[in-house]
Amino acid sequence: MKLTREFPSNYAMAQWQPSDHKDAQVIGELFAHFGAERFTIQNTRTGVPVVWLSRELLLDVMGFLRKLPSPFVMLFDLSATDERMRSHRHDLPDSDFTVFYHLISIDRNADLMLKVPLKEGDLTLPTVSRHFPNANWYEREVWDLMGINFDGHPHLTRIMMPKSWQGHPLRKDYPARATEFDPFMLDAVKQDQEQDNLLFKPEEWGMARGNENEDYMFLNLGPNHPSAHGAFRLVLQLDGEEIRDCVPDIGYHHRGAEKMGERQSWHSYIPYTDRVEYLGGVMNNLPYVLAVEKLAGIKVPQRVDMIRVMLAELFRIQSHLLFIGTYIQDVGAMTPVFFTFTDRQRIYTIIEAITGARMHPAWFRIGGVAHDLPVGWQRLVQDNLLSWLPKRLMDYEKAAMRNSILRGRTIGVAAYNTEQALAWGTTGGGLRATGLNFDVRKWRPYSGYDQFEFEVPVGANGDAYDRALVRIEEVRQSMRIIEQCMKNMPEGPFKADHPLTTPPPKERTLQDIETLITHFLQVSWGPVMPAAESFQMIEATKGINSYYLTSDGSTMSYRTRIRTPSFAHLQQIPSVIRGQMVSDLIVYLGSIDFVMSDVDR
């Protein structure tokens, strides 16, 4: 493993502003090859060029982007929007449903969003899974939740909802509250039907039940197996101990987080973000509030940026400590997990003193944070983290990472290269373990990360061992960032002085009746955001997390798209684990570092 210190300044993206990005290099390349008349460029606050095109052109454009000298190698996200109730669609193609494809070019450090308009009577698109294999699950999700078909898809079935589910929940005409449904009744007939739906039928997945000489075993790992790390089911096709193939089965933890975003105000949705990746705490608030602040045009004070960075890195450390302890436990060592949980308690002591809560503080606000740092917070950080954890990390390395059993179980196991990682949408430590230095905090700095001195740990082999090694070193780098926050915390307010800051600064409400009225409206009814689209990605605990928000000029989001890293990481499992042993699968699952709420949302 190596550390990267220097980063080319020309790769750091400028502050994202409302723009149509017509000057982007890729726009010129598309116009030159296909003709400008075949595209519509949308002006957004996403910071990304947004290009509308017809479905007939989609596959040709995808193939073209894949073959450019600096190609777009990752399908970062794929989802859809029900446009039928949207009021503010000025100068956009006529569309009832819109499918969008978010692509990333690593060589350019650039993004591109493609949008395809569809009419309600003809909701069909060609699959792009032959260009991007990770489109498989994303297209299944779009069909499941929006009802859009993808011709040529290898297995277009439900992925979040049960097989027996009626309707497509993310459509605007689908109820958003449980009270709008008839009472649920589980009689004997329905129970038998649901149990039959859960039976795995190999033929449906193109799997043989055996070869000429023997039958294969089909084994359910989960959804309640301790090594599955949550409500996650893997159906394994086994030839003895060898895994010939497997089918991941997700959705058991699905709670409709994106649908909830359509029924909560911009302010009251913040606690819901905490639960998307329940180990990340305020790390989940960050991309959401940054995206909302782009909509509102809010620039937060420097003190707010640094407070947010410090809290985000505290949660990164406690999440990585949980990973280290449970990963070593998966390999067979029991003792380290108790030490890592003890160390996590020290970090929670800091978090609770600052925010008032532990795992789910919901502490970030639109335009700032909930309140200022408490008196004596520096001593808490020093005593419970900076003076304690460095030595403990050395102990973990000696006891675990240099342990011959762990090394034997992990080195060379479940390895993949950078090209494969990008093809499956892998981000975070799982991508950097392959040798690629791609950390959003460095490549696309947000919240003032460009002001901090830290290095990006990078592996070399892309195996289960390197994925653990990278995360241990990331803990050290997070401590460096926190120490800089402690020494350089600027003075100033903890909220922006902006009309859409929610809640508004308290001292203003005590002097100005108009501000008090604004406070009442924004907290009870909710702030009204300008009609626009915004996007923000961050380097979260498990990989890149992002929020893509569509405002229709209301107190609530018209469409809240949450892209989580773990969804992509679990889709990659079959391609990595085929031909390996069941024991290797357990190690691989532990090395991914996922929680099912991050997958299922």
Swiss-Prot record:
Similarity field: In the N-terminal section; belongs to the complex I 30 kDa subunit family. In the C-terminal section; belongs to the complex I 49 kDa subunit family.
Classification via HAMAP family: NDH1_NuoCD_1, NDH1_NuoD
UniProt subunit comment: NDH-1 is composed of 13 different subunits. Subunits NuoB, CD, E, F, and G constitute the peripheral sector of the complex.
Function of the molecule: NDH-1 shuttles electrons from NADH, via FMN and iron-sulfur (Fe-S) centers, to quinones in the respiratory chain. The immediate electron acceptor for the enzyme in this species is believed to be ubiquinone. Couples the redox reaction to proton translocation (for every two electrons transferred, four hydrogen ions are translocated across the cytoplasmic membrane), and thus conserves the redox energy in a proton gradient.
Topology relative to the membrane: Peripheral membrane protein
Annotated segments matching region NADH dehydrogenase I subunit C: 1-191
Lineage top rank: taxon: Bacteria
Catalysed conversion reaction: a quinone + NADH + 5 H(+)(in) = a quinol + NAD(+) + 4 H(+)(out)
Protein name (database record): NADH-quinone oxidoreductase subunit C/D
Species of origin: Aeromonas hydrophila subsp. hydrophila (strain ATCC 7966 / DSM 30187 / BCRC 13018 / CCUG 14551 / JCM 1027 / KCTC 2358 / NCIMB 9240 / NCTC 8049)
Residue ranges of the TM segments: none
Database matches in InterPro entries: NADH_DH_suC, NADH_DH_suCD, NADH_Q_OxRdtase_suD, NADH_quin_OxRdtase_su_C/D-like, NADH_UbQ_OxRdtase_30kDa_su, NADH_UbQ_OxRdtase_49kDa_CS, NDH1_su_D/H, NiFe-Hase_large
One matching Pfam family: Complex1_30kDa
Subcellular localization, as worded in the UniProt entry: Cell inner membrane
EC number: 7.1.1.-
PROSITE patterns: COMPLEX1_49K
Principal location: membrane
Keywords linked to the UniProt accession: Cell inner membrane, Cell membrane, Membrane, Multifunctional enzyme, NAD, Quinone, Translocase, Transport, Ubiquinone
Region called NADH dehydrogenase I subunit D, residue ranges: 215-601
GO molecular function: NAD binding; NADH dehydrogenase (ubiquinone) activity; NADH:ubiquinone reductase (non-electrogenic) activity; quinone binding
One GO cellular component term: NADH dehydrogenase complex
Broadest EC class assigned to this enzyme: translocase
